[in-house]
Amino acid sequence: MKILATMAAVLATLLYNFSADANELSDISNYREYSPTFSSSGQPTREQLQLLKDDGFERIVYIAFSNNGNAFADEDVAVKELGMDYVHIPVIWDQPTASDFYAFAGSMQREPDRKTLLHCQVNYRASAFSFLYRVLYEDVSVAEAKADMNSVWQPNETWQNLIFGILEENGKSPHCEGCSWAIDE
């Protein structure tokens, strides 16, 4: 009986630790993992930055403004204190530019194998940039990248225009079998 109780306690501990570990990153707002080295999300908390570090992330790229509602002003300091690289590319929500995207892509291309989290406030900007980056630089199909982006949101007209323009500049079509770019109003 004592052995059975000990085994149950060990099993319970293992299950607790497994479930806690499995859900930690998924607790970050709209967290999406695209590959072993690239993820996107909404704004992580200060505590979640430590989780990212513990999971092997080496670079945090932030593409919103530090004065946004749920941002914290010293994220750059917190990230650097954890030993990760920090890149800040402020993207105006209703005026994103191709230059904004290419600044992000350039930072990724300098060290493409560094484990990176791209984030904004709710993962709208970040999932759109992730879509473009994956299609243009990682040879992910439009259908797969779009399905991932649409698990977060369906881009509005402003963002759709940016996406279509950048794809066109790079000789890619936004269209794919089963893809709909209809904007939900």
Tell what function each PLM region has:
Residues 120:
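Short cysteine clusters
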Residues 18-117, 131-185:
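Cys-dependent protein tyrosine phosphatase-like superfamily
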Residues 5-16:
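Bacterial N-terminal signal peptides
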Residues 124-128:
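Glycine-rich nucleophile elbow surrounding the catalytic serine of serine-hydrolase chemistry
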